[in-house]
Regions:
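Preference for extracellular/luminal or secreted protein segments
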Residues: 2-7, 17, 23-84, 321-421, ...
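Bacterial N-terminal signal peptides
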Residues: 12-22, 125
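Second-shell loop/turn segments in exported
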Residues: 44, 74, 92-100, 144-158, ...
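N-terminal carbohydrate-binding/catalytic regions of secreted carbohydrate-active enzymes
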Residues: 61, 65-116
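Second-shell residues forming the walls of enzyme active-site clefts
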Residues: 62, 103-110, 205-365
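Hydrophobic faces of well-ordered beta-strands that scaffold small-molecule active sites
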Residues: 68-75, 91-95, 120-126, 174-178, ...
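Short, acidic/polar
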Residues: 75-86, 156-164, 250-256, 326-332
Length: 456
């Protein structure tokens, strides 16, 4: 697992510990099986103690707490993150530009992990170019398009590895990158220079290198935006968008997803595109059972089955969703459709979303077994052991203010100049920034959309 690599724990120790507690496979939370201890071997010999049961780490949680373990929510501060964990037992957080400085300065993620009942998923979207949350501290990183035009795949892998090491030092575990979108849009379009190339083969080559670099650093990459956003009719931050029909996507936009679907220790993010021939006109891919089946099975576009966790794009701040669905309904519909982790950019609405999902389970619309499978997938990338009494490998036990030393660069401005870019990663001109360093969208933002935290 990538989380084991991230924490540099000895595999032998983990395997031995699991063997000692008799854990051979994960049991669903509601179906954990007990194992009987052996009897005495003869007169005067004490009976062997019972072997500890292999209970899921989620077995002692209420249904509501287990549902909350699937949510990934954006936080506005470390205090906001602590409230989400303490009040709702949230399993994942997303940190945007406004929180990165606090994390770097105060080491808040190690403290946050210490209060969580299980290792948290800590995510960010660090693509490079105009989608870079850590640039003021780690220096600039080129956009995907610039990297593909100026660097070899080996150089891109090394650049991503260095970026991943900085993220790991902060305590980040998941990066919503790279983009697998195939696009020839102008640089500042919604995808634009976030795409490596208009050539699917080149996108595959460079996205493979970028994701390998993140994995080298112990960061879980999440490919996006399935089934392809590169030829969309607009920006899903501001309106419903469509892409070409499925038969056209299969031969072009879906090729990188097909080539990389079998990459171990990775996730996928579904976008909010409407796809003729797949999703219909009434809902985006992120809430379409057909879109999740396409990704999971792989048969419909010539890919292997995808076994990793599936995230949604932001469900609260993007109007392709929020204009038609309330947050509680969007979260519930996404889980019913097949998402493992609904993602949204604020801690608002957690309670209402939990109420809605609980109601769906109570009404038989959402099966508990379906949630158990999602919990198992999310536990895998969070480093949660299969057995409740196994070693909790994901928690940063004994960490200082940060999980690992950070090669900090001073932020630009009065505090000092920004660190120069690595020679292997030539910098590009910085895009104009909105409030809190938000990357600039392709059209003026609506006032209700809090762009600084958006997972792009």
């Amino acid at each position: 697992m990538s989380f084991y690599r991230r924490l540099r724990l000895t595999t032998v120790v983990a395997i031995t510990a699991l063997a000692l507690v008799g854990c051979s496979s994960a049991a669903p939370a509601d179906q954990a099986e007990s194992q009987e201890g052996g009897e005495g071997t003869g007169e005067g010999v004490a009976a062997s103690p019972p072997i500890s049961p292999c209970d899921s780490p989620f077995a002692q949680m209420s249904q509501r707490e287990r549902i909350a373990q699937l949510f990934t929510v954006g936080v506005s501060s470390m205090a906001d993150a602590r409230r989400a964990v303490e009040q709702h037992n949230i399993g994942g957080v997303f940190i945007g530009s406004s929180v990165v400085g606090e994390v770097v300065a105060g080491g808040g993620l190690a403290q946050l992990q210490s209060i969580a009942p299980l290792p948290l998923l800590v995510s960010i979207d660090e693509e490079g170019g105009r989608v870079s949350r850590i640039a003021p501290y780690a220096g600039p990183m080129p956009s995907a398009r610039v990297m593909a035009n100026t660097m070899s795949p080996a150089e891109v892998r090394e650049t991503a590895r260095k970026r991943g090491e900085f993220l790991a030092g902060m305590g980040v575990t998941v990066d919503f990158a790279p983009s697998l979108d195939v696009s020839d849009q102008p640089d500042r379009a919604v995808i634009g220079d976030r795409s490596f190339s208009p050539d699917p083969a080149r996108v595959t080559e460079y996205a493979r290198a970028f994701s390998a670099g993140l994995l080298d650093a112990g960061i879980t990459p999440v490919f996006k935006h399935f089934p392809g956003h590169g030829r969309s009719s607009g920006d899903s931050h501001f309106d419903a968008v469509t892409v070409p029909p499925l038969d056209q996507l299969t031969a072009h936009d879906l090729r990188p997803f097909a080539e990389l679907a079998a990459t171990p220790d990775t996730g996928m993010m579904l976008g909010h595109q409407q796809v003729p021939g797949l999703t219909g006109a009434d809902r985006p891919a992120s809430m379409s059972p057909a879109a999740y089946r396409l990704l999971r099975d792989g048969h419909g576009y010539g890919a292997p089955a995808f076994e990793g966790p599936i995230f949604t794009d932001d469900l609260s701040g993007m109007r392709a969703v929020s204009d038609e669905f309330s947050l509680p309904r969007a979260v519930t519909e996404a889980l019913i459709a097949g998402a493992d982790s609904p993602l949204w950019i604020t801690t608002d609405g957690i309670g209402e979303a939990l109420d809605s999902v609980e109601a769906a389970v109570a009404n038989g619309v959402l099966q508990p077994e379906r949630l158990d499978r999602s919990l198992q997938r999310m536990a895998e990338i969070r480093g949660i052991p299969e057995c409740a009494n196994g070693p909790v490998t994901g928690r940063m036990v004994g960490a200082g203010s940060l999980g690992a030393p950070l090669p900090l660069a001073a932020p630009a401005g009065p505090a000092g100049p920004a660190a120069p870019a690595s020679p292997a990663a030539p910098a590009e001109p910085a895009a104009p920034a909105g409030p809190a360093g938000a990357d600039v969208p392709s059209q003026p933002p609506a006032p209700a959309v809090p762009l600084p935290l958006l997972p792009r």
